[in-house]
Amino acid sequence: MKELQLKYGCNPNQKPSRIFMEEGELPIEVLSGRPGYINFLDAFNSWQLVRELKEATGLPAAASFKHVSPAGAAVGLPLDDTLARIYFVDDVQIPLSPIACAYARARGADRMSSYGDFIALSDTCDLATAMLIKREVSDGVIAPDYTEEALQVLREKRKGTYNVIKIDPAYRPAPIERKQVFGITFEQGRNEVRLDDPSLFQNIPTQNKTFPDEARRDLILALITLKYTQSNSVCYVKSGQAIGIGAGQQSRIHCTRLAGNKADIWWLRQHPRVMNLPFVPGIRRADRDNTIDLFIGEDYMDVLAEGEWQKFFTERPEPLTREEKRAWIAQNTGVSLGSDAFFPFGDNVERAHKSGVQYIAQAGGSVRDDHVIDTCDKYGIAMAFTGVRLFHH
């Protein structure tokens, strides 16, 4: 198949629409559904991310994409009881495989943003992964293969219209890529930089020069995630998964704040009072996610006001005070942070420190690098200048 006709482009008025190959066959097979233009943009960007994560770490990888940027990305490390609970996978009746764990982490880190996502899996989608996917609101999945059991489960999702794409894992695109804007063709070499190259962590200008193996893995995960995130972008990572991604901001500090706030929410979801909220029986997953997000945030009265809390809880829970939130967030440590370009000011490090960041990888090259280094030294943060910019547009 050289081309595939689509219903429309980015918007319903943008017709006709198709994907096609100028040379050779499309490296995909649609096994279920009818993916759209944006679905394919998410699918092909997310597939590159998980393929590179698998190559770099040797671990199964998964990503959750929305509007051509990742909401989550992770490798297949086992879930502890706390993460299984906050990702709502503690009730699964069969053991979770490594690829299922990767998906649970990628989907679970920022559940609000992942609602209606497109999923990418580096490895064959098995039954456990398909069972997790089936219960979530999602547009589709791309993977190199599917077991028969998994495919049967996915084909039942959304009354048989769920988008399932199989991609040839051996496919490699041409070294030159092109796109058109306003009728003008842009051409560039593909971004083939290897982000697991040990040389990226050789230029360490900070007093603390120690990067444990886990931190290096997490920084590689952050950098690969940023490679496929709309710029400007910043990514916080802990224990093999992105916990906060700030994408598409014109200001670097706003990226760092946005991603840091997401990381804080991820950590606050593990607070005992949040994990034990007395939800009414049968509450929908999306309503539970939204209620938790409001309860943690500044607008908690939206779900705690008289006449409102009864819709969500069997009894009215006491909100967390600002002091309680700060005390809990202060317990989060060992976080790694990647940036797709240099930090122009030390304020990014100040904000990152508040969310438990102890390791940073960024391009370096700012006229104020000395200020950024001094701020890292102030908190004992280890920072590497990679010399690699990762803009993505």
For the regions a language model picked out, list residue spans one by one:
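Gly-rich Lys/Arg/Thr-decorated short loops/hinges at beta-loop-alpha junctions or inter-strand turns
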Residues: 22-34, 109-115, 188-209, 286-309, ...
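Glycine- and Gly-Pro-enriched alpha-helical subdomains that act as flexible
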Residues: 71-111, 243-342
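A structural signal for short secondary-structure junctions
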Residues: 56-57, 111-114, 227-229, 329-332, ...
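Flexible, glycine/charged-enriched surface loops at secondary-structure junctions
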Residues: 56-64, 164-167, 231-238, 268-279, ...
